[in-house]
Amino acid sequence: MGDRSGVGGEEGEKSVLGASAHSQAGRRQQHTPAARRGAQRAPAATAAAASRPVFAMRWCCGGSYSENGGGGGGSRGAPPTPLLTVAATSSSTAHDTFGPMQVKMLKTAVIVTEGTGESVLLDSLRASGWICTVSFPTQATSDVESICPLAVFIDLRVPHPSQIAKDVSSVSTEEVLIVSIAEKHISEKRRRALAQSNIIHHVTWNTRDVVLFDYVGRLANRIRALPALFAVLDETDQAVEICDEQRVVQYVNRAYENVTGCIRSEVIGQPESEMRRKSLPRARGEEERRRSCDWKFIRVPFANNSQFVYMKRSNTTGDTAAIFRDVSLKSLKSQTGGIEAPISEVLTMLRDVSARVDGEPAQTIKDAMKVLSSHELYAPSINRFRDADRIATQYYDGLIRLHHPARQRKRSVVDAHREKRGSHGERRRVSADVKNALENDNCWKFDILHLEKVSDHHALSQVGMKVFERWKVCDVLGCSDDLLHRWILSIEAHYHAGNTYHNATHAADVLQATSFFLDSPSVAVHVNESHAVAALLAAAVHDLDHPGRGNAYLINTRQSLAILYNDNSILENHHIALAFQLTLQHNANVNIFSSLSREEFIQMRHAMVEMVLATDISRHFEYLAKFNKMHVTDVPEEQRDTNSLTICDMLVKCADISNPAREWGLCQRWAHRIVEEYFEQTREEKEKGLPVTMEVFDRNTCNVPITQCGFIDMFAREAFATFTEFAKLGELSDQLESNYEKWKVMTSQWTPTHNTNLVL
């Protein structure tokens, strides 16, 4: 037994804090308050810090503690008949079972008083295993911040106890029980007043009843273990969904967000959805498994069944990375050969390796992937084509290589964003035929060529105003409806009506497709308003003043535009530059940006330029790889605009090459139009003795269905598979494949005689 102090016949005891100043002489030795605080605060802070979960590769909830720095514990003197006693053991052996987890019962408290704090209450707390630190009012805030106690007791005799309680609440990173202490019970009126300062309980100095504090301490220690569990759930590769007894979603982890594309805030609080779980992409190699087996129901081991947990089964092949949004990190390998950006292969290998390692190597690999994803390393490498595949080779030579070394570089990517603007119908007067033709402009089967006919080749201005009004473009730009109408008429007038394909109707078609893509909820949630408007405007101007000849032709003929833009994205640079020249000229009165601030205009212009340049087919694989590296969950707020722009780049690009995915009749007619334009370019190149850009488009020998299959193989299939998976518009890829099969059937039936009068 320890020595006894003669004060009040109290039994001396070894301090639970393990401070040497208290171990032999008893608690009432004559020490200064500062010395007492120093002896108590340091071990309490150390023990409190040790109790916090720390994430490395495993999770710990609490550190070890022994009296006097050792592992043993001597007998403890019994306090004056407390209501709740604890065995005279080291505090390090007190544990609580929280489900399958063992939680250390580390109970820390701060006593805020100007005295010593010694009392029946303090004796009872210590006897019950509480580690108590006495703190002066001036030190209370810093002590609470460093120790992170479960409870704070405030002596009502100190000055401004309510303010101390507020200060303690403001600095505490954990939930803390704040209790007032007085010589006697206080009135109900004062209790209510103290409650305004987060003081929610009251005791007297001579109370021995600490059962409530022990119970709160037990719950608080359990609650403080939960962040470790949530952090582990967020790090796991398997998607997890937790529902309450009403089957309302309470929690989903980060892997669930990656798999579904749904942000956590969108799902929590919503009823569970079996359809949502069934619609999730499967891990690779699990195609034979029934959908109902993809998700495992985990029964929570409690009688009331108040929670339901669903976990996506891991891939049987062990490829844990497959649960992430598989927007084709590895390309869909076109049938024409291996088209793969080297950076995609590197990142795929790194991702596979990271799934097999833990700890520091895994983090190092993630850091390396982040660096690689943020550098301009996405220009494609065309490995090889089959010798007999002239179509793919000539598409590459004519549209990408341009008869000179192409050195495309790429900006970095990130992710995520906000919502689109609402919609309402048109106000402008139009003829009945035009109005009927515009009836379903928000549908994918919309017939823009019929609108071209009934509007006398004014499809762009007609569908443009309908789309702009639905998306409230005037509100975003701060311009009038009349001004916007004058602008779109000016843009329409500068398209070449003589071009069979690159004319104002094609611009209208791309604008309608852009609006359709933006209308997808899976897209809209990630795109901010200004980028949505920029995408619509960019679609309208993306081929402005197109001469009906490609970039390679302009280079070979040494056109002034090729010289001006140094053979880089010649037409795309010209389209957007002319659009801004026409818009900003003072005497035209069509400046739709006049109400924007300088910063707003710069941002709008940057977005439009970026989106129009993304339509350069020679940079197709660059932008595709950029989109593939994008993640749309758990991204910092400052990176969401970058992600929004990346989505819009891909969106406008897909709209520009969307003809193969249109309804079959439209698909055919658009194909005939662009082939006719290529026929004319090939004829002119041969007449002038120029290098022939794509010899396959010779009217006398061309098999049009083969050229369309080649374009789908090389460009359209992967782009649409990638984007429509993200946008949840799988029916478009289905239509593209259906058209592909029709073209394929026609290849054996096509003869050069069909090439006459393709466009009637």
UniProtKB/Swiss-Prot annotation:
A divalent metal cation 1 binds at H506, H542, D543, D656. A divalent metal cation 2 binds at D543. One of its GO terms (molecular function) is 3',5'-cyclic-GMP phosphodiesterase activity. GO terms for biological process: cAMP-mediated signaling; negative regulation of oocyte maturation; positive regulation of ERK1 and ERK2 cascade. Binds 2 divalent metal cations per subunit. Site 1 may preferentially bind zinc ions, while site 2 has a preference for magnesium and/or manganese ions. Its EC number is 3.1.4.17. It comes from the Eukaryota. Its cofactor is a divalent metal cation. Residues 412-429 have a biased composition (Basic and acidic residues). Residues 1-47, 410-429 are annotated as: Disordered. Residues 426-750 form the PDEase domain. SMART domains: HDc. Residues 33-47 have a biased composition (Low complexity). SUPFAM superfamilies: HD-domain/PDEase-like, PYP-like sensor domain (PAS domain). Keywords: cGMP, Hydrolase, Metal-binding. This is Probable 3',5'-cyclic phosphodiesterase pde-6. It comes from Caenorhabditis elegans. The lineage of its organism: Eukaryota, Metazoa, Ecdysozoa, Nematoda, Chromadorea.
